[in-house]
């Protein structure tokens, strides 16, 4: 009985913390849009574009689009406020991890880890820090 109550509580807590990031297998509206490196101008040719079901890395005319997105609820452990998006476009390890942080509802945050794919990281050098949203 006690274990069941804990697992129900844990599932509810996880659902609440990730609700802002993903809704109905779509990226929540707060995270959709153009994201550039924190110190870059919004006119930067280097950006991450997040749509409901597609993530596109852009660097000038160069683009890499990923449509097979997957949420990873266990990537960061218990009690986190983030959702991690992975791509299943390729076999093996996903080429990237995008962290959607909805802990501050007024200012959602996005960061990218391209360390699993050196070519993608070289083509789209977004860094590992938080990105800023351009409106």
Regions found by a protein language model. Give the residues of each.
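Short, hydrophobic/aromatic-rich segments at coil-to-beta transitions
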Residues: 29-36, 52-54, 78-86, 107-108
